[in-house]
């Protein structure tokens, strides 16, 4: 079922206040709260979950990252999911983006992390070869419109020496990213991350069996992975897990006809807060914030859970 998404976007802008800098994330939270269940909502919901994983987190906690990067990463995911782009195409577009380089900032760091995050490869010997291919890519601080920002710069002296890497021959940096996005380990690694997101450390579920079943179906899109997972018997019947704040709070709000005030989202996901604040940062569930994504399991240490409980009890 389709909806007029533009209507809800205007409604969110008119109805709510947002922070000067944090608006890109607060706006997405408000939009997910306001919109009804629909195909549009499901596509945005998938993108939101992906931006909270190690796969696509914008990592706004880093000084090299801006809050606008969170909007860019989220909207690119939504757009490509709606275009029915494949997982490999989406991963490739993300890896070559400035937003990704603001998260992992040098050829050595970026290439190492791409192999670890998307392929589950932890071979130190491969890093110098990958960094050689990306030797002319760098993140530099430059002045744009009178303001200093971190910008991806691609130099005019690319690597010209072929290297054997990831089962193929790589010369330039884009060759490396193509090798990662086309590698046979990409889909199993992505599926594993998404399964961990929904099953956490649940000992009653055989996660590897679930991962194998999904991979055997040869999913080409994120829609295929999420649909397979959400309608699996393991998820519908067997899984027992603490719910993330948004999952619990938004659901309860709908059931009891509770409505958020104009400044609710402005303070719900704010970067600088005191220990007294009811805020996703204090529950360790901040959206699109952490360099390595949200914790796989909802944090239930004493302090984090106390803030979680306080947020649900006092804000609703």
Predicted regions and their residues:
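N-terminal accessory alpha/beta regions
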Residues: 1-82, 98-103
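Second-shell loop/turn segments in exported
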Residues: 31-37, 55-64, 73-80, 99-101, ...
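Loop/turn elements at helix/coil->beta-strand transitions in domains of secreted/extracellular proteins
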Residues: 42-44, 83-90, 123-125, 186-192, ...
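Short, solvent-exposed loop/turn and secondary-structure capping segments
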Residues: 59-66, 101-107, 141-149, 204-207, ...
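Activity-critical C-terminal alpha-helical subdomain
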Residues: 84-142
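Flexible, low-complexity segments enriched for small/polar residues
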Residues: 54, 183-316
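Nucleic-acid-contacting surfaces of polymerase cores and analogous helical-repeat interfaces
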Residues: 109-112, 118, 129-202
């Amino acid at each position: 079922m389709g909806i007029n998404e533009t209507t809800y976007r205007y409604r969110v802008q008119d109805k709510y206040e947002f922070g000067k800098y944090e608006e890109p994330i607060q706006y997405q939270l408000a939009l997910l709260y306001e919109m009804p269940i629909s195909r549009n909502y499901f596509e945005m919901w998938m993108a939101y979950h992906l931006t909270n994983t190690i796969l696509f987190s914008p990592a706004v906690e880093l000084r090299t990252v801006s809050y606008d990067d969170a909007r860019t990463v989220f909207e690119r995911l939504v757009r490509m999911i709606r275009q029915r782009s494949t997982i490999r195409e989406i991963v490739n577009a993300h890896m070559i983006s400035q937003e990704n380089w603001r998260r992992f900032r040098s050829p050595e760091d970026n290439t190492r992390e791409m192999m670890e995050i998307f392929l589950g490869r932890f071979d130190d010997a491969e890093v110098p070869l990958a960094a050689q291919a990306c030797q002319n890519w760098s993140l530099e601080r430059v002045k744009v419109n009178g303001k200093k920002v971190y910008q991806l710069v691609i130099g005019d002296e690319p690597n010209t020496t072929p290297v054997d890497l990831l089962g193929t021959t790589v010369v330039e940096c884009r060759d490396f990213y193509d090798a990662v996005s086309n590698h046979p380990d990409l889909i199993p690694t992505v599926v594993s991350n998404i399964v961990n997101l929904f099953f956490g450390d649940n000992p009653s579920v055989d996660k590897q069996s679930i991962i194998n079943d999904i991979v055997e179906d040869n999913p080409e899109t994120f829609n295929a992975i999420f649909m397979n997972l959400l309608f699996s018997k393991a998820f519908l019947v067997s899984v027992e897990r603490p719910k993330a704040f948004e999952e619990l709070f938004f659901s309860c709000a709908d059931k009891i006809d509770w409505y958020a005030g104009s400044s609710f989202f402005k303070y719900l996901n704010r970067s600088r807060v005191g220990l007294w604040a009811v805020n996703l940062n204090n529950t360790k569930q901040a959206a699109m914030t952490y360099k390595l994504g949200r914790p796989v399991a909802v944090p239930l240490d004493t302090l984090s859970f106390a803030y979680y409980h306080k947020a649900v009890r006092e804000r609703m």
